[in-house]
Amino acid sequence: MPQSKSPTTEAVPIETRNGYGTTIAAVIHLPAGLDTGATHPAVVVSPSGGGVKEQTAGLYASKLAANGLVAVAYDASFQGESTGMPRQLENPHLRTEDISAVIDFVISLPYVDTHRIGAMGICVGAGYSINAAINDPRIKAVGTVSMGNIGHNFRNGWDGSVADADAAHMLAQGATARIRDASGEGSERYPLAPRRKQDAQNREQEDEWEYYHTPRGQHPNAPGIMTARSLTQIITYDAFHKAEVYLTQPLLLISGSEDGARWMTDEAHDRAASRDKALYVVDGANHMDLYDRQPYVDDVVSQLASFFADRLSRSGA
């Protein structure tokens, strides 16, 4: 259902009502010629770890809008143009709550149907979208791209080969960082993406470095780091917790055939209680290719747009 004209955008501040006191910076992507006198489905697009709305989340939101869907990309609390201290906090529970906070705002828009809300995300934003759907039944359909369950990422490594117990040292590192913070010694930083190409442990992590630290995808609001104290919140986190019971919404889980972290997409599919769930594999693509590279992105968008249009087609779906 492509539109003939480019979508329009509107930057909005979202005052959260969740007790954390942050203001989320968001951009609403509207299909060209949207009838604001009627109500429409909307999709909340969550950024990757340390990513901002001007990067891959914004790219997907824009393309979904070009395919007729209202889409909202945003900066996580404590990151980008959103407020909150300490800066670059990556607390997975708050990242998940951000999605529900954006939904609180989106359903107040006169042209959005409260009962036709979808969620999608890229990398750990996909994991957070899954977790939000487990917690928040207002989400009626979920799409994921290059899934990352941030707890798995940090505990078990890129390919899932590291035992949980072997991540205990990172809990200790996070605890030490909190001691430093409490003592006024400053907030220690921890890389979310390799700081240098030579720090990468595989080809996909080289691509991750390239995306966040070169003109390919870099943005001044996305330094590719987080607070080290975040480790105490990440290591024990599971984005798929209770998916076997509460993740009942329709799911479309997309990964590249060459994605070394594809096991997390497969796990989400296997654990979900949903009876309407599908895997879509993009031939030849790795994890980072689905952030921005063509023809992969347009292939993914075509799948997502069709999925959301169908699953969010009826009020009260």
Segments from the language model and where they lie:
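Short beta-strand element of the alpha/beta-hydrolase
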Residues: 38-48
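N-terminal cap/lid segment of alpha/beta-hydrolase-fold proteins
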Residues: 2-38
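Catalytic histidine-centered segment of alpha/beta-hydrolase-like enzymes
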Residues: 285-298
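Alpha/beta-hydrolase-fold enzymes
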Residues: 130-211
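Conserved alpha/beta-hydrolase
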Residues: 63-83
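The serine-hydrolase catalytic nucleophile loop
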Residues: 49-62, 76, 265
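Short beta-strand/loop motif that positions the catalytic acidic residue
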Residues: 246-247, 253-255
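Alpha/beta-hydrolase active-site loop
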Residues: 56, 89-110
